[in-house]
């Protein structure tokens, strides 16, 4: 029987980050995603969900109108399926909005790793990428009037940036190499 804790979907789908395999940490293959929220103006429900591939650093942004965990899980699942995103694992923080994400992981047939409380450095790729998003949407700015097409443009700009870590290739160049 499942306990009432939403995180505890089962003992095989939702795992602590300490059990994440080393090969995921090495960033050798695409499909291992980090997911986080980017909050807007205080006292507003609207926020962004950022999804970042650990290997290629590809960014996807989703506008979220509510911080409800089931709404968020459904929103992420639908976005991943609609955009045919390659998913092999998911890593998230302990935010309340992600407590039902185990359901999404189970539907996708992947493992969900949750970080330790107050350890955002365990999702460093995501945190670094969120800082790039903040160049376009400063902290405290309302997300209410940001249409998805604007967020897609931000993703395109960030994904098109040459990165020193990749010998000045952009995300799209890397994906061409990986998905030949």
Describe each region flagged by the PLM:
Residues 1-48:
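Mobile-element integrase/transposase regions
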Residues 36, 51, 57, 76, ...:
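Mobile genetic element proteins and their domesticated derivatives, centered on retroelements
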Residues 40-41, 66-69, 95-98, 120:
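Short, catalytically relevant binding-site loops at active-site mouths
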Residues 41-44, 61-84:
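Active-site beta-loop-alpha junctions of metal-dependent nucleic acid enzymes
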Residues 56-60, 82-88, 136-137:
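Short, surface-exposed connector motifs at secondary-structure boundaries
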Residues 75, 102-104:
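A short acidic, amphipathic alpha-helical/loop segment
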Residues 85-100, 118:
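Acidic/histidine-rich, metal-coordinating catalytic segments
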Residues 105-112, 116-180:
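Charged alpha-helix within mobile-element recombinases
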